[in-house]
Amino acid sequence: MATGGGGGGGGMGGGGVGGGAGAAGVGVGGRMPTWRERENNKRRERRRRAIAAKIFAGLRAHGGYKLPKHCDNNEVLKALCNEAGWVVEPDGTTYRKGYKPPERMEVIGCSVSPSPCSSYQPSPRASYNASPTSSSFPSGASSPFLPHPNNMANGVDGNPILPWLKTLSNSPSSKKHPQLPPLLIHGGSISAPVTPPLSSPTARTPRMKTDWDESNVQPTWTGSNSPCVVNSTPPSPGRTMLPDPAWLAGIQISSTSPSSPTFSLVSSNPFSVFKDAILVGNNSSRMCTPGQSGTCSPAIPGMAPHPDIHMMDAVSDEFAFGSSTNGGHQAAGLVRAWEGERIHEDSGSDDLELTLGSSRTRAAA
């Protein structure tokens, strides 16, 4: 009787499992199984049911297990757990007898029911419920790493910094480099980017200084005594830069300066323009340009005149401009024209007149 009942129970249990397997077989791949596949499944299911019937019959006959007539594998597992000293509740909760766990262990929104003999202790997870004012600093009420009365009541350490981060700034590696600043770690999340506050110097874009008109703002090269600065840098129309009189003290200015534009390009005394500026007066606004005199030196008001001494006296006669190789001597300051050149003695650069039109119009004018 017991054996027959066991066989019937096994048949019922096997049928249930077999039906599930058949349904799963139909759903696999989204197609209907072929005839040969269905026959193989039936043969496999009949063999499984026969083995399950023998197992249930042996447990009822020799093990003394209280198995219902129509039982499944879960009932057999429950019976085996009861014999081994485990308790299986109707919802499936299993634990050793005498070590019933607490009702529920709430840990930051999740429930964990560890086994009594397990050494696994769930660690609290950090909360990332950010406050409205910042996207990286968690709120104090939801984060377990911030000091809060609720956190201390739940047994969670309210220390805002982890212990191993505390000793990071005091480690030997940081002592080797005393010039490095100490490590400052915020109590919240340190992985999210943080927008610097308005008081931070990095939050404001660097701005150029616009106080160019102030008298105390001077270039770095104005204090130098280099004579090349004055000649190579055109002065501003709004201000007059006076060169250092020290480097002009030893220069002797000549009174003779031909009016030919060609002479100024190869003039033996390019500083003759300074005397013209002195003779005009202190309030003169005459500025010399390379197109007019060949030099780019501003007028220097207030400079005392010097005796007229030719600078060409220190140069050899054979290298002087206008000298003759046949032994002839020419007067100083005269220029001899070469082939194809005309020297305009009677017209200066200021007397030139520009006319437009054809040759007839110019002839009539």
Swiss-Prot record:
Keyword Transcription regulation included in the entry's annotation: yes
Q: Which GO terms describe its molecular function?
A: DNA binding; DNA-binding transcription factor activity
The biased composition feature labelled Polar residues covers: 215-233, 356-365
Q: Where is this region: Required for DNA-binding?
A: 31-113
Which branch of life, at top level? Eukaryota
Q: Which UniProt keywords apply?
A: Brassinosteroid signaling pathway, DNA-binding, Growth regulation, Transcription, Transcription regulation
Summary of subunit composition and partner proteins = Interacts with PUB24.
Indicate what this protein is called per its UniProt record: Protein BZR1 homolog 2
What species is this protein from?
Oryza sativa subsp. japonica
The organism's taxonomic lineage, starting at the top: Eukaryota, Viridiplantae, Streptophyta, Embryophyta, Tracheophyta
Q: What is the primary gene name for this protein?
A: BZR2
